[in-house]
Amino acid sequence: MSAIKDHYKQMLDEYHIVWEERQHTEELILNADEVVKSPGIPGDAPMMLKIQEKGIPVISEIEFAGRYTDAKMVCITGSNGKTTTTSLIYHIFKSAGYNVGLAGNIGQSLAYQVATCDYDYYIIELSSFQLDNMYEFRANIAILLNITPDHLDRYNYNMQEYVDAKFRILQNQTDDDAFIFWNDDPIIQRELSKHGIHAKLYPFAEDKREGVMAYTDSDELYFTAPYAFNMEQEELALTGKHNLYNSMAAGISASLSGIGKEVIREALSTFRGVEHRLEYVARVRGVDYINDSKATNVNSCWYALQSMTQKTILIIGGKDKGNDYTEIADLVREKCVGLIYMGLHNEKLHEFFDPFGLPVADVQSMKDAVDAAYRMAKSGEAVLLSPCCASFDLFKSYEDRGEQFKACVRAL
């Protein structure tokens, strides 16, 4: 249990909300009518088990706040791309002059904004952990970007439990609502018939086919409904194949919300990327340093490696969540000229990647990782921090990990 930051204490005091830190007063919690749980707390934590034993309802902050607003909810989930797509949609809505808030895993809490603002729309990034404790909340537009193995340590290493959590974004939707999804995702395709979907379907795909609302053809990105338009891929602010899909999802959601095609096209071309996601840091002695600290699972790293055009030193490692590195094996062989294992327990990385015959280094701090990469990289190559893992073995968060990386690079 950690301390509360000073500015949050000040805010709690301002609103006369009782708080405590570094402890839980069991008597108070177990006498509650309802518990709002932070998504980072696992369901098998000792206090949570006591709450369950007493039969006290447990909800997420999103579920709680959603009771007190009639605003339209545009909700985004998926294993990868959530933050980028959420930020991109928010950028489009703001560009259109909409009265809109940004919440969920990004921005201020939904509860704080509902209490202090009067927005017409909220763009909400939802993790599987948040969805687990949502029951009556309704997304007017639900977006499911993709599903790949992630957080399996929180789901009994059972992929179906994780998949079911992601599909909770559809609960309570009606035929007035919209479900936007990646049509090429095999898991999503397999699951569609299982979940009794009531919303209208708006799939997007890599190629043109019947029924898709956005697709690519040659170097163009096409939107078919409700406002048909196209734009050249090179006009998009975000690069990489994965960002084509993120842009499709964002464009469809904006179109469905009444935003015109010219505004959407302009916003897709002016968006500035998300910090810690394929973020260019600096070029040092001819070597480019890229911060992809937000890549906390293998699939995120796959997208990052796929986008690399230079030979790459990959910094990988952290708190393993049941990772299967097979997904990136071919890309590591093709793109990488060295590996830096950064973590307290790197045995699994050694076992999987050492047979590739690449130069490797073991480190337990960001400074050592950057120094090792600096020694290993040659002019014209790149150093990519894309860890595949959670950050909590050596860092406070993925943001802390990314900030340390940038600071160490700039100190070279």
Set out the residue ranges of the language-model regions:
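Phosphate-binding loop of NTP-binding sites
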Residues: 26-32, 39-183, 187-199, 393, ...
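Short active-site oxyanion
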Residues: 32-34, 98-100, 174-179, 286-289, ...
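Glycine-rich, highly charged phosphate/nucleotide-binding loops
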Residues: 13-28
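NAD(P)-binding Rossmann-fold cofactor-contacting core
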Residues: 1-9
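Nucleotide phosphate-binding/pyrophosphate-handling subdomain across enzymes
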Residues: 231-336
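Beta-strand->loop->alpha-helix junctions that form or flank phosphate-binding loops
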Residues: 20-23, 59-63, 196-216, 267-269, ...
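C-terminal helical cap/extension that packs against the catalytic core
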Residues: 9-13, 326-381
